[in-house]
A protein has these predicted regions:
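C-terminal His-loop and adjacent cap/lid subdomain of alpha/beta-hydrolase
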Residues: 1-259
Length: 259
């Protein structure tokens, strides 16, 4: 959701299929500074706090699902998706591999609103461990585990598609399993004169002026995420199946080609 705009709806998000142009994902994405290719503006999430010496310690924890449905690579790349961003010293980034948005219970469940059964990977103990590390980092000055996330430089962060075709570095097609024809891309639009400085919407745009370029984690031949570039739970460290982070909408739900 989004909190920093007038009349924000904290639980509402835009996606590939719904809530297009709701201002949920917009520049700047990175904690350090990057340049917006559309406006030429240089900015970063922590720019003001770094200038005042009040920057917080941050653990950014997300799953591999966020790369497909939320533009999850943009906090650690430039907006064009051509190079890795530099994380400030007080920021750690952890990508939880082979996982859906919310932690599973470890037990399988039948499919419902999606074409695939919900991903059962139970990753909540990983976030709980990182929370304990955060407390030690703040209270005792103990360094937390190093960041672990896929990167452009080593080939572990890749394009989801090559043109209209799925990129086999991102997904190896399986018989009987439909795969996404596109992923969610945050758009840039005109919300009026007060948007940039006050986060007040004076104009509700009907179209985007352009789109940023999110990437996704590369997978192995079994379509599972790597232990070297994502944090894996025991269930996904020695997988007995493919732990898919995305799920296309069920036919009964509608828009079955959408995430």
């Amino acid at each position: 959701g989004m909190f920093n705009i007038r009349f924000a709806m904290p639980t509402r998000t835009n996606g590939q299929h719904s809530n297009h142009l709701y201002p949920n994902d917009y520049f700047p994405f990175t904690y350090g500074e990057s340049v917006d290719p559309f406006s030429g503006r240089s900015d970063g999430v922590l720019k003001r706090s770094m200038a005042s010496g009040t920057e917080p310690k941050i653990m950014h924890i997300q799953t591999s699902n966020e790369y497909w449905v939320r533009g999850g690579s943009l906090p650690h790349t430039n907006p064009e998706g051509t190079e890795d961003a530099v994380l400030p010293n007080g920021v750690r980034f952890y990508t939880l591999g082979g996982s859906q948005h919310g932690s599973g219970s470890g037990l399988p469940r039948p499919a419902s609103s999606g074409q695939l059964a919900p991903n059962p990977n139970r990753w909540s103990p990983l976030s709980e461990s990182l929370m304990a590390a955060m407390v030690r980092w703040i209270a005792e000055g103990a360094e937390p585990p190093p960041s672990r996330y896929p990167r452009i430089a080593d080939g572990s962060l890749v394009a989801s598609h090559n043109g209209q075709e799925i990129n086999h570095d991102a997904w190896n097609p399986l018989p009987g399993i439909n795969h996404p024809t596109a992923i969610y891309q945050p758009g840039v639009a005109d919300y009026g004169m007060r948007w940039a400085s006050e986060r007040i919407i004076d104009t509700h745009p009907q179209t985007a002026r352009g789109y940023y370029n999110p990437l996704v984690p590369a997978v192995n031949l079994d379509n599972n995420d790597s232990a070297e570039t994502t944090v894996l739970s025991p269930l996904t460290q020695v997988p007995l199946a493919t732990f898919v982070p995305w799920n296309l909408r069920a036919v009964a739900t509608g828009a079955p080609l959408s995430l």
